[in-house]
Regions:
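Solvent-exposed aromatic/hydrophobic patches embedded in short alpha-helical segments
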Residues: 70-84
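Glycosyltransferase-associated regions of secretory-pathway enzymes
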Residues: 1-71, 87-233
Length: 233
């Protein structure tokens, strides 16, 4: 069973008090529509402490990295040990989680169109081997010297899911036919759901147009004195 916990990583634990449109149409609606779920916000210090506890000596592999890269490995440990929902703070929401899962659901794996498996939305029972394997792959790639946020994060996640479920590594953007086959195979497994999304407006937790999401996100980051991890803005 998936525990009703929402994991958010953000540098301000009072973010729900924000009047930013991104939060109004996202995190606030998520909390409002799912009152029986426990929201847990972890700031940078919480993430550092959690990684030190769970990684032990392997923490040295994460220590020099950007906080975004640390959050990527943190979410894998969180999902494996605790389960629930990990979601990026910039996701829009107007649909309850109640219609997405039931007592038999073990994992929901959205796909970002036919590009890759969504790395910003993880919904699972604890003890999922996908997350265990993802941690192992992350550690192995760090030991090999990799430090790219995208490669260690979203791309490694795609590689691990496909290797765990299909015994072969399938790279990002494998084509419509391949993703159709993968979704069909995953949905045939009891307890698993794989749903195609067209983010940011058409996802498993949002339907319809909510305004200029890109501008909402940029404004929210600016209000918090942050730059996007890509450095583009």
């Amino acid at each position: 069973m998936i525990p009703k916990i929402i994991h958010i990583a953000w540098n301000d634990k009072e973010v729900l008090k924000s009047d930013a449109p991104l939060i109004k149409h996202g995190l606030k609606k998520l909390v409002e529509l799912n009152p029986d779920w426990d929201l847990q916000i972890s700031d940078d210090a919480d993430i550092e402490a959690y990684l030190q506890e769970k990684m032990a000596e392997d923490y040295e592999l994460a220590k020099p990295l950007h906080i975004v890269a640390k959050t990527d490995i943190w979410r894998l440990y969180k999902m494996f040990f605790e389960g629930g929902l990990y979601i990026d703070i910039d996701r829009l929401c107007n649909v309850s989680l109640a219609g997405l899962i039931d007592a038999d659901t073990r994992q929901v794996l959205p796909t970002c169109r036919n590009h890759d498996f969504a790395h910003d939305f993880m919904l699972s029972a604890p003890g999922n081997p996908i997350y265990k394997n993802a941690v192992r792959a992350w550690l192995a790639r760090r030991k090999d010297g990799h430090d790219s946020i995208y490669f260690l994060g979203a791309q490694t996640y795609m590689h691990v899911i496909t290797h765990t479920l299909f015994d072969t590594i399938i790279d990002t953007n494998p084509g419509d036919e391949m993703f159709d086959r993968m979704r069909k195979a995953i949905n045939a497994v009891p307890g698993l759901k794989c749903i195609e999304e067209d983010p940011p407006h058409l996802t498993v937790i949002h339907e319809g147009f909510a305004g200029n999401w890109e501008q909402m996100k940029r404004d929210f980051y600016a209000q918090n004195g942050l730059r996007h991890w890509t450095g583009e803005w």
